[in-house]
Curated annotation (Swiss-Prot):
It comes from Desulforapulum autotrophicum (strain ATCC 43914 / DSM 3382 / VKM B-1955 / HRM2). This is Small ribosomal subunit protein uS3. InterPro entries: KH_dom, KH_dom-like_a/b, KH_dom_type_2, KH_sf_prok-type, Ribosomal_S3_C_sf, Ribosomal_uS3_bac-typ, Ribosomal_uS3_C, Ribosomal_uS3_CS. The keyword Ubl conjugation does not apply. Belongs to the universal ribosomal protein uS3 family. SMART domains: KH. GO terms for cellular component: cytosolic small ribosomal subunit. Part of the 30S ribosomal subunit. Forms a tight complex with proteins S10 and S14.
Amino acid sequence: MGQKVNPIGLRLNIVKTWDSRWYADKNYADFVFEDYKLRAFLKKKLFHAGISKIEIERFTKRIRIRVFAARPGIIIGKKGSEIALLKKEIEQMITPEVLIDIQEIRRPEIDAQLVAENISAQLERRIAFRRAMKRSVSSAMRFGAQGIKIICSGRLGGAEMARTEWYKEGRIPLHTLRADVDYGFTEAKTTYGAIGIKTFIFKGEVLKADRNVKA
């Protein structure tokens, strides 16, 4: 089971939490679609800021958007000018009052989504996939990851037949629910077709003592 399922979904409410946090009755489908539109808009507009994930919380009359970025300065701008423009653009898309929080990712080398997107960018620049994967693996281990696994699937190197290649270093305990396993996925759009990239990064175990849970 642990080998097939999304590691974040498997650990929800154990060591991971939801990216969208709100309750809805009859407006559920509208809110889901609104969240999808917001994430797609922000990922496209703030691509150069290195966006890892976007959390959305809804209250009665306002919505809080928390953006996790490797380069928060690009989003905020000089004296907050860029973030003010961004807030206006979002308020034209949705009705509630918008609050935007920017969280800096201090070590993007061990953020699974950013590692996957970095490999994707290298493949689109025609860098050899093995070199890109090995570089990311060694960089993650150097910055404190306890284990990393990268899987690339598709017409690798322009081959006629699609195949899957992977590199792994350290350990990735996919069945251990207390293990903090980060997961990222993206696609590289190459001239030969799309190449899927999955990244698993093990950052250590979240023990009961750390979460203040009494036995």
